[in-house]
């Protein structure tokens, strides 16, 4: 096994600083990596690397279960989820667990069950991680050849890729099954202000599903982030699940083509870099999704989007001033444009004032008031329902603009609530994580390419210039 990586390629960049620290044959001299290089010490020890990965999965699932129970313990049913800093319960609520009409929480027991199940499974993963890290075989190739591998074995690597794809496909179909057969999911667009419903009429048309991928990512187009009905979301999961499963079977049954063998680098570090790149794309996409999309991330649980809070403010004051006798169709604002209503560049009637820049917002509390040419004046005068007024007043004061040390909400809104929106938390964290994963991709891709080319980027530590310089003092 040791012959796969020649010391000439890998070792010169590592600094020996403590030769006495030995870890069961995984010390610095034998691996070329110090203890702080983590799993790099286990590149050729498939059994121990398995232990590290299983233990890592256990930590992830433990966090999910513990945080889930923490949120359940702190949950106050009288306040909206987004005002309580929750990030896990909104996900469970979106899946339809414990939710009634209008996004009201009617039962927290499913949330408790979710937390306990995650804690129990994290214990199983934790024991598995400890076993494979400390007690199990160092390498799997001899005893369990199905689970063993050599990084350079292209056929085995694509088989492992195929297994992963099949598991992802099964995950996508779990959401489909929940939406179709097991109680349904929460639909923020359900009449009267949202409800849990089973999805019966899936969108399976490839022109619609793949049309999202071909949209521009800018402006009102919004790429896949612009999806705004659950039929498309669940239908998209049918497509993606099928593609992942069939792609997985394909990769298990076939060997890489010649062009792929030539174009790709086939080493553990290269696979790490590919994985980091994929996770980076996931992170950036999730960032945009949770910030802009109020269908996959319903505002009842995650709080309004930025544009939604802004439009809600304009709507709330239109309702108030209309009651006080203002003619909202013709009133002029300080700039000479309409104070309450104006026209968009393409002729639709939109809200006036600063919120004009968010004129292409779509939200379930606002859409019933639109006609064929934008906002319908007669509907604004006669058809506004109390639930629309209540919801917009609530969203107006909960804009996702707070920072840790500020009063949340729009700076000009005197009733804004001091909180940080889950949309802010989730989009910011996923942007930052996506960015660092991308940097990690560049780093490991550069190292993997250098090693494949027969040289290693870095300074030869034996001849490092600083060792020959006069001490500063």
UniProtKB/Swiss-Prot annotation:
GO MF terms, alphabetically ordered: chlorophyll binding; electron transporter, transferring electrons within the cyclic electron transport pathway of photosynthesis activity; metal ion binding
Pfam family, one: PSII
Record-annotated membrane-spanning stretches: 69-93, 134-155, 178-200, 255-275, 291-312, 447-471
Modified-residue entries (Phosphothreonine), positions: 15
Note describing how the cofactor binds: Binds multiple chlorophylls and provides some of the ligands for the Ca-4Mn-5O cluster of the oxygen-evolving complex. It may also provide a ligand for a Cl- that is required for oxygen evolution. PSII binds additional chlorophylls, carotenoids and specific lipids.
InterPro entries per UniProt: PS_antenna-like, PS_II_antenna-like_sf, PSII_PsbC, PSII_PsbC_sf
GO biological process, one term: photosynthetic electron transport in photosystem II
Keywords noted in UniProt: Acetylation, Chlorophyll, Chloroplast, Chromophore, Manganese, Membrane, Metal-binding, Phosphoprotein, Photosynthesis, Photosystem II, Plastid, Thylakoid, Transmembrane, Transmembrane helix
Compartment(s) of residence: Plastid, Chloroplast thylakoid membrane
Propeptide, chain numbering: 1-14
Residues the record lists as N-acetylthreonine modifications: 15
Domain of life the protein comes from: Eukaryota
Membrane topology type: Multi-pass membrane protein
GO cellular component: chloroplast thylakoid membrane; photosystem II
Binding sites annotated in the UniProt record for [CaMn4O5] cluster: 367
Gene3D superfamilies: photosystem ii from thermosynechococcus elongatus (1.10.10.670)
Reported function: One of the components of the core complex of photosystem II (PSII). It binds chlorophyll and helps catalyze the primary light-induced photochemical processes of PSII. PSII is a light-driven water:plastoquinone oxidoreductase, using light energy to abstract electrons from H(2)O, generating O(2) and a proton gradient subsequently used for ATP formation.
Family indicated by similarity: Belongs to the PsbB/PsbC family. PsbC subfamily.
Record's subunit section: PSII is composed of 1 copy each of membrane proteins PsbA, PsbB, PsbC, PsbD, PsbE, PsbF, PsbH, PsbI, PsbJ, PsbK, PsbL, PsbM, PsbT, PsbX, PsbY, PsbZ, Psb30/Ycf12, at least 3 peripheral proteins of the oxygen-evolving complex and a large number of cofactors. It forms dimeric complexes.
This protein's name: Photosystem II CP43 reaction center protein
Lineage: Eukaryota, Viridiplantae, Streptophyta, Embryophyta, Tracheophyta
Gene name of the encoded protein: psbC
